[in-house]
Amino acid sequence: LCTVIHLTACDGTTDPDKVIPDIDTANVVDTVNHMAADSKEGLGQVYYSAKYSEITKELLNNWLENREKSVTYAEEYQKIVAKMGGNAKIVVGLTDKNVIPGLTSGNPAVKGSAKYDVLFKDTSAYNLADRIGVAFVKTENGTVYQLVCLFDVN
């Protein structure tokens, strides 16, 4: 017996970009959008993307597995980013294959220790973003890490 579960939004849509898959992801998207709206610049909203959340998850896995190996990290980063094609780019988050942020950066972070204000440090970069990718990865020792990336897909 096999059961297929399709997430459905309140309005009946099954579009993966319109259905946020879990409460933790929804909380991150809501927090980022509330902080943007409440900022002195009155920054715009970003919209959840299943596709870019998958890219974000791959980036987080690469960070977890290769952050001590800069060459491998950069090579894997390039492979992951290439999947986006030429019409999208990461504008906030893991934006550079040659810069491997430490855990103290606040993004990536241990779940519950994320510093969302780091997403707004460069408001001109934030203003380019229209999609948000959110990822959580549980490691073998049970620690859950999270990463948020903002994408310009226009």
Where are these regions (language model features)?
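C-terminal motif of bacterial Sec signal peptides marking the signal peptidase cleavage site
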Residues: 5-9
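A well-ordered secondary-structure block
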Residues: 78-154
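Short, well-ordered surface patches within globular domains
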Residues: 15-89, 130
